[in-house]
Amino acid sequence: MRAIKQIVHFGWEQALSCLFPAVIFASLAITQIIPLPFLPRYDWLLIICVLMQLWMVRSGLETRDELKVITLFHLIGLALELFKVHMGSWSYPEEGYSKIFGVPLYSGFMYASVASYLCQAWRRLKVELVKWPSFFAVVPLAAAIYLNFFTHHFSIDIRWWLSGLVIIVFWQTWVTYEVNGARYRMPLALSFILIGFFIWIAENIATFFGAWKYPNQIDTWSLVHLGKVSSWLLLVIVSFLIVASLKQVKEQSPTKAEMDESFS
């Protein structure tokens, strides 16, 4: 009975952490079924995302520090979108006033929503990292993974080499989390795989509702190739590494009270 209670509590905390992504998916579905007046669909999606972000901060569901991380992800995601659309990896075929070089600005919020989930789940589940690697190993690895999304169009795709490096670097790393007062743990690599798989499922839902289209989905929707899991897995790793590194820096930085005490 306790196991069921723990699973339900864990699911509830995860659902609360997924609030921003859930609103985006609901907006994609509603605007696909019910056309909204006055503005193109992409522009309404941008307005909804901005209002949702403001509400999340004003309501206290997200802190200002988390907003900084989420904004960073928005910019990182938007840069990736601009490049990938230019290279023909996917497209946004609908009209919109808020499109830049074929990319609607709301697309950055889809990446930001992943950061929102990570930040909130981290706080709600009181996540801690055990045997976290050196900053000097984590940052170059995250940078290499992100850059490979660009460079593989012009040279060798090294995603599988990078995946192997991730396993080596984080072989001894565990993530611990709290559910209803009890602490649990799992290998960090397993958490990467699980999050990447669920984002692939979310990607299928998003493309079904016309968030964007891959070349094989222009005429009719089809399941996103399972190989995309590897791409999302690596993107999740980049996201997690950035959030974790910023959390580590935040925890190691002295608070104002500590600084005042040290000078007293």
Curated annotation (Swiss-Prot):
It comes from Bacillus subtilis (strain 168). It is found in: Cell membrane. This is Uncharacterized protein YoaT. The chain crosses the membrane at residues 19-39, 42-62, 69-89, 100-120, 136-156, 160-180, 192-212, 223-243. It holds the Pfam family DUF817. The keyword Membrane applies. It is a multi-pass membrane protein. The lineage of its organism: Bacteria, Bacillati, Bacillota, Bacilli, Bacillales. One of its GO terms (cellular component) is plasma membrane. Keywords: Cell membrane, Membrane, Transmembrane, Transmembrane helix. The keyword Transit peptide does not apply. It comes from the Bacteria.
